[in-house]
Amino acid sequence: MKVLEFAFSGPDNAYLPHQYQPRCVCYTGTHDNDTAAGWYAAAGEQERAFAERYLGTSGAENIRQALLRAGQGSVAELFVAQMQDYLGLGSESRINVPGVAEGNWRWRLLPGRTGPELAEEIRSLTSLYGRCPWRPEPVEGTEDGE
């Protein structure tokens, strides 16, 4: 089990995607971790700086996308991301805080929160990294791309 939110203490960290062995599962975070946006907001200066350097980007929205790409593109046999990470939601959407008895397991994906754009983002990433059947992206100016 490789949790990307645990990865950014330095280049030798076993949770960094370049350290993975194929027979593992990669997660952006688990039900016991903050969302990717919440993690980034709360990360210490050194951890955030290393994550930005490793992922080649900065800013919460860019980091969210980079974490999803890093996980999808890793050699992990499976990749799992919370819907909150695809939606870019912050700590208010965290599922569980270990050791806290109240207020956990309340987050719900409400109708209208997703749509064709999100479905296309997920399909595009999973297809690009070979995690679902590949189909070419339409090219503008061609028969399929109008």
Residue ranges and their predicted role:
Residues M1-P138, E143-E146:
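Catalytic cores of glycan-processing enzymes that make or break glycosidic bonds
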